Structure formats: structure tokens, C-alpha cells
Regions:
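Interaction interfaces in information-processing and related assembly proteins
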Residues: 1-229
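Cys/His-clustered metal-coordination modules, chiefly Zn-binding fingers
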Residues: 197, 201-296
Length: 296
């Protein structure tokens, strides 16, 4: 279970949220068997999605982040509900790359830079909001910052990090997002820049035992902060046999007829690796169900 906190400055000029997502990213690594660099990429995206999801107002709202820079990891995707509960995957869960020139895991090399970050917000309207920006670095935090500046016109500071142990378990993972509110002027921007000019990486702060609340106060020492809310997000998949059945029906009757010829049809959830098995009799029932819908 993760820990997430959201704060607002007393002067009403900015918000800051921070999260410890170590348990969440560990769970993702267990499910997908990710290599170190893919754990770092997926973990950063899961953390960003959790933070962004927690800021959604509607109980049933959700946000999905998808990044594909034509790197060896392929598409990396993370989705969050409005409580910050997340799930995600990378198309290629095992990628081995040398460390980058800073001696760190080469997330940019795994993700690639030739592509887009897509943000899909389902706010319960007729159509979801979709924003898309070109990848800036493939390091993910910079790409999230660029998304907010370009698509939502919100000045943002985003920091994300994942520390991977030699045995591929996750030592620490987390991040923070600072966002200026419309009341902020140039002096506030200067104040924020001064605050963050010499801070430790977020994983270093977590490794020192700092809580998300302490991280918020550490990165913005010049601001008095009021806590908005706290939550304990987790890695949570919402797949079910009913959802998988609906997905199979949506393929159309012709495809279902083909599946009926197989001894069994196995569908595996990309997010949690749970397997759903459908026998020819199950497919028959789905065909009947789809016929009933067509007759209405």
C-alpha cells in the first residue's frame, strides 16, 4: 500500500502532492517480472498516474497515461482511479541496457524519444479528454511537466524516481508534483525555482526515511503548507470475468464462432496477469447474449 498526500500553500498560490509508491511498484514488478530499467520506467509512470488520479474530483473519474517513444520497452501504460489506485504494464517487460552516462538506469533509452505521451481523462462526460504531447526526454517526469505546460497550461514541477535492488525488488519509489495556481505571479515562480534548485532526488529523500508530507515541506521550505487530504493507494486491477466476456462479445459473432471451434479460449489480463478460461459452452452463451443484444 502506498502513501499519498496533497497540500496547498497558505497563500493559495500552489499545490504540491507527494507519494511513496514503493509497495505499488514492487507489486507491479512481481506481476510482470520486469527487468530493472523497465521497473524504473513503469514505476515512474505508475507514480505519475497515481498522483494525477488523486487530483481528480469525481468518484468515478480516471486517468490513463500512455508513453511510447519507439524504444525497446514498447508502450508503457498506467491507469489510475480518483483515489490514486493504479495498474499498468509495459509491452516488453524485460529490456537490458547499459547504465546511462550518469551511471543510472537508462529509462530514456528503454522508452525512447521518438513518439508521444498521451493522457486520457475519463471525467464521466460523453467523450474522454485526450491530450497528446511529443516526448521531450523519455525520462517521464520531464514529459509529464511538458504535458501540463503544453496541454493544460499549468506551470508544473514533476519529480519521479525508482530505486531497484540487485535482486530486482524495489528499494524505493515515489514522486512529487508542484503546480502553480492562477493566483501565482513571477515572484512565486522565482521562489519555487529557488526552493527546488538544490534538492535531493525523491528516492534519496525516501531512502532517508522522509514521509510524503515531509517531502512536500522539504521541497518547498519557503511556503507554509496546509494539508488537503491523504490516501493509501495500491496496485489494483479492476478486471473481472464479466468485463472479459463483454470484450469477447465486442469482437463480433464471426470471431466468437471461430473461438467456439477451439478446445478452450484463454484470455490473460495485461494488468494483473490473471487468466480467464472460456469453454466452447461458454462461447455459446456469449453468442446467445450477443444475439439477444442484436435483436433488441
Amino acid at each position: 500500500m502506498g502513501k499519498l498526500i496533497r497540500c496547498i500553500s497558505e497563500d493559495g498560490t500552489l499545490t504540491v502532492m507527494a507519494a511513496d509508491t514503493t509497495d505499488i511498484v514492487n507489486r507491479a514488478q512481481e506481476i510482470h517480472g520486469t527487468s530493472a530499467v523497465v521497473s524504473a520506467a513503469l514505476g515512474r509512470l505508475l507514480t505519475a498516474a497515481s498522483l494525477m488520479g488523486s487530483a481528480l474530483k469525481g468518484a468515478d473519474d480516471s486517468v490513463t497515461l500512455r508513453i511510447n517513444g519507439n524504444g525497446p520497452a514498447g508502450t508503457v501504460l498506467a491507469a489510475s482511479d480518483s483515489h490514486g489506485n493504479v495498474r499498468g504494464y509495459a509491452v516488453n517487460s524485460v529490456v537490458e541496457l547499459p547504465l546511462n552516462d550518469k551511471g543510472k538506469l537508462d529509462v530514456s533509452g528503454a522508452v525512447g524519444k521518438d513518439g508521444f505521451l498521451t493522457v486520457i481523462k475519463d471525467l464521466g462526460l460523453k467523450e474522454p479528454y485526450v491530450g497528446q504531447v511529443q516526448i521531450v526526454s523519455g525520462e517521464i517526469a520531464e514529459d509529464i511537466t511538458n504535458y501540463f505546460a503544453t496541454s493544460e497550461q499549468i506551470p508544473t514541477v514533476c519529480a519521479l524516481g525508482v530505486l531497484v535492488n540487485p535482486d530486482l525488488t524495489i528499494r524505493k519509489a515515489g514522486g512529487f508534483i508542484i503546480q502553480l495556481l492562477p493566483t501565482a505571479d513571477d515572484t512565486i515562480i522565482d521562489k519555487v525555482e529557488k526552493c527546488i534548485s538544490d534538492i535531493d532526488p525523491v528516492t534519496t529523500m525516501l531512502d532517508k526515511g522522509l514521509s510524503p508530507e515531509t517531502i512536500c515541506r522539504t521541497v518547498l521550505p519557503a511556503f507554509k503548507l496546509d494539508m488537503l487530504d491523504t490516501s493509501e493507494p495500491e496496485y489494483r486491477c479492476n478486471c473481472s470475468r464479466e468485463r472479459v466476456s463483454r470484450a469477447l462479445i465486442s469482437m463480433g459473432r464471426d470471431e466468437l464462432e471461430k473461438l467456439k471451434d477451439d478446445e478452450k479460449t484463454e484470455v490473460c489480463c495485461q494488468f494483473c496477469d490473471k487468466k480467464y478460461v472460456f469453454t466452447p459452452a461458454d462461447i455459446d452463451r456469449l453468442l446467445e447474449e450477443s444475439k439477444g443484444k442484436e435483436d433488441k
